[in-house]
Amino acid sequence: MQITREKWSKNFSEWFDWVLREGEFYDYGRYPIKGMGVWMPYGFKLRQNIIGIIRNFLDSTGHEEVLFPLLIPEDLLRRESTHIKGFEEEVFWVTKGGSTDLDVKLALRPTSEVAITTMENLWLKSYKQLPKKYYQIVSVFRYETKATRPMIRLREITTFKEAHTVHETYDDAQKQVEEAIEIYKKIFDTLTIPYVLSERPEWDRFAGALHTYAFDTIMPDGRAMQIGTVHHLGQNFSKALDFKIQKKDGSLDYPHQTSYGISDRAVASVIAIHGDDHGPVLPPSVAPIKVVVIPIPAKNEEETQQVMKYSIEICEMFNKNNITCLTDQDTEKTPGEKFYIWEIKGVPIRLEIGPRELISGTVFIKRRDNFKSYTVRKEEAINKIKELLNEIQEDLRRKAWEDLKSRIEYSNDIEKAKKILGNNSGIVEVPWCGSNECGLKIEELTNARVLGYPIEKREVNDKCVICKMNAKTVLRIAKTY
Amino acid sequence: MQITREKWSKNFSEWFDWVLREGEFYDYGRYPIKGMGVWMPYGFKLRQNIIGIIRNFLDSTGHEEVLFPLLIPEDLLRRESTHIKGFEEEVFWVTKGGSTDLDVKLALRPTSEVAITTMENLWLKSYKQLPKKYYQIVSVFRYETKATRPMIRLREITTFKEAHTVHETYDDAQKQVEEAIEIYKKIFDTLTIPYVLSERPEWDRFAGALHTYAFDTIMPDGRAMQIGTVHHLGQNFSKALDFKIQKKDGSLDYPHQTSYGISDRAVASVIAIHGDDHGPVLPPSVAPIKVVVIPIPAKNEEETQQVMKYSIEICEMFNKNNITCLTDQDTEKTPGEKFYIWEIKGVPIRLEIGPRELISGTVFIKRRDNFKSYTVRKEEAINKIKELLNEIQEDLRRKAWEDLKSRIEYSNDIEKAKKILGNNSGIVEVPWCGSNECGLKIEELTNARVLGYPIEKREVNDKCVICKMNAKTVLRIAKTY
């Protein structure tokens, strides 16, 4: 079968809406509040599997899950002044309880630094308790005035994993930043999402952070999308909330903090990145159903029933071996209609089982990613499927990385950079002297957004694309979500 | 060791606050918004285990998990008039986004009937899709004006499992009510929470329901607490939202719905019900840590280290056998201090491992519930612990049921009933003619709350405690949370 990526790349926005709706992942645009969608059962399971992976990586590195209230009083949110400035125009406010006006406005959490630091101030007294790493997975709210998009730009972000850590020293917090980056790399690798890691420029840091490191991926339409951020908060929040701990030397001081987040966009990326014109291809690591069995009707009813029985038997065999399998037993749909449905749900492997397979005791296997097919004996099916699931997982990751890398170009000519970005072809790296002035000028001239610069040292034997001084590194620019 | 239940029964409220704080389950009263608490890591794990049990029972009976937006527009919430009347004074309203006044006020969901029915109206068209059973586990909000209590009466209920089902006929919905009741019985049995099941009287139904069935348990102070409700909604919401489906006979009609909920109170009950003056006793089915190992220091450092090594080895053996175990390796606390800590965390089994156990290759086991102790050889430890965990689980359930049953009294004398309730001794059943008038009079005269009447037929050869007509059933009354 021919694999095309026309709709997927040329009309990604329509493709994505179509997949979310027809694949029954997420109902968007019909709930009567702008920017808020509904996770349908199939999408919810995908989301749960992704959350499961995030939880495993965090739990196994000493992070402890907690759950804080949704609401933050206005006076508390205002304690860190840069922070509130960054969020002020995006906060939803609760002002009434029943018919009573509240004395203090309550914010729907846009993020939880101040809420969590408030309680850390009560819980943590000594360096002996550090490092401390909390996280929660919650809804956060942003009163977005830009155009909203399902899973990508929402007013209710329903899957915000936010980690918050506390350390004795600046360097300890920096080490935590590095650990967080390593954890995120593993999470995105497991999710088969390729990424570019950059330090965000000074003018685009998280409100209240000393440093912001960000993971961006490239979506099918060539736009970059931020999928994870890691912030070194220094003592900004501990000072604002007067949170001190006893240090090793006996003195009292403000601890250093970090925070890092991953959102619904992780789910959006998993659905989008490996897609084709048939729909998404879900990586086996998170696919809610790994194998779907489509029984192919025979010429007579009796044989059709035997095929169904054989199909169910095969499927049970997979489930017993922890390979989540479902047999589509609908008798009103044709096999072709079922192929369409399960392709748009992105199930990685399909089995087609008809009279031929029944008689020969075989199964006919089709991979969703490249539509290659295999026929194996029933007894060999478990091993073959396990092998194919591993292959699919690796192939998806490898191809997505190749695709991402092919979309990063270097240019020392600002006009050429602008032209590349105009073609929606991903990320352009331009040589940069390191000054904010030149950085902002680059954004202005390309009408694009600066993602930042590599965190590792980058040798650039070139001149800054703006001021023509010696370049210290490259600045990455892209059209973004 | 002597087991006392003085603090637990006489000053339950203080006992509960003490356990939540010292056991590090839930930080309450210190977050700067009334009625909103913080789930700390240990409490969060307990909550997750309880949610896991709820999910298993729902998933295995064809319920599908979804996630709806937190906010409900005012006009939508007003569509079912009885419903909004019931909740109107308890709703938190979002009225501003940034500095902009919103055109339509948005409610923080108090419950989700109207939100979910709105989308069901788009998703469900035919009887062939029915029955449909959705559920979500979310925060709901009530602007409580009564005194709030941790986990029991909150302004943010963070663990609201709400199921919503759709059926072709009234009878199908009634069957679903029965299924829901059976599921809840299994959930509460697994959680070792005893209950009384009643149909709530007409004047205390869920706002918008035709029938409300409720599970109440009795807390240590003798007050009844509602821990689960099941509602037959009839066509009230489908009519209000103009939600029709095609029936088997081809006609279009409003489907019948049910909804049922369990909240944070399930966690509160698990912590409260089996407690004693040392703290709670968590049932093994949900305890985050099933076995804690306390190494007992020896006279010299070398032997102490060997004890520690042996302790860790034992603990790893349990973990490998899926018995969650933790060794308390803190070298600054005495064994006695550790006993105190892990008792207040309710860990069902403690091992004390010292030089004697090291030399003899044994483990010393102590049950948290009755403080009985056992010494077994290391090789027998796994089996012994498994056996004890089962015994503890069964003993907790059995004793809690005995305790509950001993707190239900029958009285055909309203003055005596009032006196019993004044002593906080649980639930009183009084003979009742079935009229609302007499029911309300009973509430008034006893200064207590009517829980309702048994759902099964109850033979009562007695006269109504108010009107002296022949009693049709009993009415249950209690001081309640």
Swiss-Prot record, chains A, B:
Pfam families: HGTP_anticodon (PF03129), ProRS-C_1 (PF09180), tRNA-synt_2b (PF00587). It catalyses: tRNA(Pro) + L-proline + ATP = L-prolyl-tRNA(Pro) + AMP + diphosphate. CDD domains: ProRS_anticodon_zinc, ProRS_core_arch_euk. GO terms for biological process: prolyl-tRNA aminoacylation. Signal peptide: none annotated. It comes from the Archaea. Coiled coil: none annotated. Gene3D superfamilies: Anticodon-binding domain, Bira Bifunctional Protein, Domain 2, C-terminal domain of ProRS. One of its GO terms (molecular function) is proline-tRNA ligase activity. Its main location: cytoplasm. The keyword Protein biosynthesis applies. Keywords: Aminoacyl-tRNA synthetase, ATP-binding, Cytoplasm, Ligase, Nucleotide-binding, Protein biosynthesis. It is an enzyme of class 6 (ligase). It is found in: Cytoplasm. Its EC number is 6.1.1.15. InterPro entries: aa-tRNA-synt_IIb, aa-tRNA-synth_II, aa-tRNA-synth_II/BPL/LPL, Anticodon-bd, Anticodon-bd_dom_sf, Pro-tRNA-ligase_IIa, Pro-tRNA-ligase_IIa_arc-type, Pro-tRNA_ligase_II_C. The keyword Aminoacyl-tRNA synthetase applies. GO terms for cellular component: cytoplasm. Catalyzes the attachment of proline to tRNA(Pro) in a two-step reaction: proline is first activated by ATP to form Pro-AMP and then transferred to the acceptor end of tRNA(Pro). Homodimer. Consists of three domains: the N-terminal catalytic domain, the anticodon-binding domain and the C-terminal extension. HAMAP family: Pro_tRNA_synth_type3. Belongs to the class-II aminoacyl-tRNA synthetase family. ProS type 3 subfamily. This is Proline--tRNA ligase. It comes from Saccharolobus solfataricus (strain ATCC 35092 / DSM 1617 / JCM 11322 / P2) (Sulfolobus solfataricus). The lineage of its organism: Archaea, Thermoproteota, Thermoprotei, Sulfolobales, Sulfolobaceae.
